[in-house]
């Protein structure tokens, strides 16, 4: 009995040891790797990063460093990327820590969203490659399923409270290696090139400074909303007899195109057909609205012009141009101002318009075309018939009945 018992103990111990080896080999990193950075040397050379390539099943794009500083999106004709967003991304990659080793079986890749996007059209993975100025790989990995911060079981207390809200765990694979690692860090891998662009506040004119907005289209009369003084409501001009404004909000929506406008995509203005350019149906007033423009006039007599064009697929885009106030707008004496003395010369110089604001806006807008959300394009293309309705005749009917 003792010999048999001893044999069973040996067998059980061997089984437990095998199970422990199997568990550690699959679900825990070796002690010398757990908590180690996935790319231990990256942070020290991070300033040498010159390109970030992100590939998914749906898209592939490159963020590239500019010699003058900052970053740009190559597939958007070099439109500026948000430097802070790119920097946060690079620091996020450099800060990824190994938490555990998972499977090496390719049959499990799909479950972890780690099939290669180049080979699987349904892949949910994102391939990330960071390159130096010579094109060499500084870091490369395939990112799969993400556990958001709310699902992270044991966040590292050493990261501090400020870092916990952005903490997540990601299943990753390194190039030419079958092993899947679970890593942890503050990394958000945005999947669209426009996610790295600041798309907010394309226009930012203070509402109180706007005097009027006029929309001109090739197939209809101009549509204009205006007000006499700051703080007043905007009024729709040239309403036909017997008609009235449906509601004030629609006029405010038109003005808001110049107050706080967000765009969805950007391309070179050369890629878009504008009025009199290309073979676009520039006078048909169709969905694209080639030839349509909206002009915002400010109380200081500066203005912003928004022109609408369309791409090869007929989708509408806009471009913008700012113009400073004319010199007379700042002159107190008008055309009769004397210029005989030094004082008059100083007055004329002081009357020169401030062009800094217009120059700043044109630097931001020049050469670019912007795609707006659909509801913004709808606002821009809204006609007079959509803004007015027949006047309420209830009072008149009441008078007739009283007179009868």
Model-derived segments and spans:
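Soluble, acidic/polar mature domains that operate outside membranes
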Residues: 1-404
């Amino acid at each position: 009995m003792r010999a048999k018992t001893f044999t069973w103990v040996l067998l059980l111990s061997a089984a437990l040891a095998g199970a422990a080896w199997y568990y550690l080999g699959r679900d825990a990193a070796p002690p010398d790797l757990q908590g180690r950075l996935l790319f231990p040397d990256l942070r020290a050379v991070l300033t040498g990063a010159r390109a970030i390539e992100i590939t998914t099943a749906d898209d592939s794009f490159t963020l590239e460093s500019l010699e003058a500083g900052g970053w740009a999106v190559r597939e958007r004709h070099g439109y500026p990327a948000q430097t802070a967003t790119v920097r946060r991304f690079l620091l996020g990659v450099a800060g990824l820590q190994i938490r555990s080793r998972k499977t090496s079986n390719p049959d499990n890749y799909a479950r972890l969203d780690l099939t290669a996007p180049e080979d699987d059209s349904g892949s949910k993975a994102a391939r990330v490659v960071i390159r130096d100025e010579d094109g060499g790989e500084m870091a490369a990995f395939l990112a799969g399923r993400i556990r958001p911060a709310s699902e992270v079981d044991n966040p590292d207390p050493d990261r501090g409270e400020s870092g916990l809200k952005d903490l997540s765990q990601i299943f990753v694979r390194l190039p030419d290696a079958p092993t899947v690692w679970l890593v942890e860090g503050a990394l958000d891998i945005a999947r669209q090139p426009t996610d790295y662009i600041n798309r907010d506040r394309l226009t930012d004119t203070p509402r109180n400074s706007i005097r009027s907005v006029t929309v001109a289209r090739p197939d209809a009369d101009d549509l204009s909303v205006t007000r006499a003084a700051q703080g007043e409501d905007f009024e729709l001009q040239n309403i036909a007899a017997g008609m009235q404004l449906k509601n004030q909000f629609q006029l405010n929506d038109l003005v808001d195109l110049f107050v706080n406008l967000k765009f969805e995509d950007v391309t070179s203005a050369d890629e878009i057909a504008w009025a009199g350019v290309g073979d676009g149906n520039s006078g048909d007033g169709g969905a694209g609205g080639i030839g349509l423009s909206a002009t915002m006039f400010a109380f200081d007599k500066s203005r912003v012009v928004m022109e609408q064009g369309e791409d090869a697929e007929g989708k509408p885009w806009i471009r913008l141009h700012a113009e400073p106030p004319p010199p007379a707008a700042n002159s107190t004496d008008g055309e009769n101002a004397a210029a005989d003395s030094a004082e008059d010369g100083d007055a004329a110089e002081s009357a020169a318009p401030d062009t800094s604001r217009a120059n700043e806006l044109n630097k931001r807008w020049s050469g670019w075309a912007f795609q707006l959300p659909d509801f913004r394009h709808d606002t821009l293309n809204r006609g007079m018939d959509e803004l007015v309705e027949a006047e309420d005749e209830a009072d008149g009917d009441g008078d007739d009945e009283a007179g009868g």
